[in-house]
């Protein structure tokens, strides 16, 4: 009965404030008086602005950065694609009306107890195994305490000292345009936690600012990397590989624009040869892989300039925001320490206990992962450029695998998918799952061209019709009478006719203007409606053109 009453109660604006407002007075004072956010005046006093002309910066920066080593680590939050939230039965739909999918548990109301979604455990184990981590068979949840309007309970359910997975790594291949090569980056830990709500500001029908708790309680996996990256390109490629992994596993859609994959980057620099780490700065608001790269490059430049001007003390442990429009980072707040969060075990949830049998069952269900797929494609003889393109998207990789399973030659299948099919998808803004062409028909098309049944030109025309409308290769060839002409006598008649109709061009060719061979070939192809076998046509044409008159 109590549950029914809770689910049907009308939401009151006051209930959207953090429950810490209703706690004891001392607790409120702790959260408000001891604020770590500096005022604008304090920030100006602590971090004097450096004025460097663009000309001076561009000339000296490359030289200066060579004297420093950059240390980069990334904390990645992956929003899980579960049907319901982590600790209640509410669904989560991106873009839903504010506060339309909430309940007493999401809102942190007194007496509302969390119940763990088993899918969160399953997805955490999957990701831990995929990232080559050591799993904790016994782990627990903890309360991470901090004050913010979008955190209704006044704490976040997370994992502190015993995360579900530790000590892993991820392998990736850098694109050729970035120097290529294989990289391995360490994974410190993977832990489960719940998401917070979101502050919505003026715009889109909203006046002022409101707290939207739809996202509160949505399950997350936080992946903490080792500080193994040394530049923006490596960091961006690491994040892209994590996106590929979670999409291959099906644990998340990994869409950065929806907040399903959020990366917080920690950057510090130190003089070459120094073993002690420099002061790290956290960067947030990174909504794309390119913004990760650019934000890191800017932050490296900023810190190097401060060091070079004797103002390294101005580099403080803080959180900075990446401003896409201004292409720079700006101070958001001073960084909290672990002690500020006052972690302690979550009393309302039991320990998470995994059995070896459970882990083994998940291990056996894992799909082929991006790294394994890249090595398999490489062993097929494909170039690294081809490998990276095909393995980047799980749907494209599945389409390619299905095509070669139908007997298509590996390189030809890759060329068609990476060329005309990819161009069509880009122009029409569709995925490979949305086109009408099937792997079976692509394999049939490749075989028809290779077997001389149709020409490559006709093949392209058929391809675009198959992509847009579907159908079969054999059906279209028969319907449109597209079978290639391979009878030498028939092609010879067409060549003779074209030469007799163009005596002036024939005379010019025999006078030394040999580029006109292409003109004659084009005329014959036009007469045959593109059906003349190109190899046979060129052979007969050359014999006729070079024959003595």
From Swiss-Prot:
Methyltransferase found in the keyword field: no
GO cellular component, one term: chloroplast
Compartments (UniProt record): Mitochondrion; Plastid, Chloroplast
One of the GO biological process terms: glutaminyl-tRNAGln biosynthesis via transamidation
Coiled coil: none
One of the record's GO molecular function terms: glutaminyl-tRNA synthase (glutamine-hydrolyzing) activity
Assigned protein family: Belongs to the GatB/GatE family. GatB subfamily.
Reported function: Allows the formation of correctly charged Gln-tRNA(Gln) through the transamidation of misacylated Glu-tRNA(Gln) in chloroplasts and mitochondria. The reaction takes place in the presence of glutamine and ATP through an activated gamma-phospho-Glu-tRNA(Gln).
Protein name: Glutamyl-tRNA(Gln) amidotransferase subunit B, chloroplastic/mitochondrial
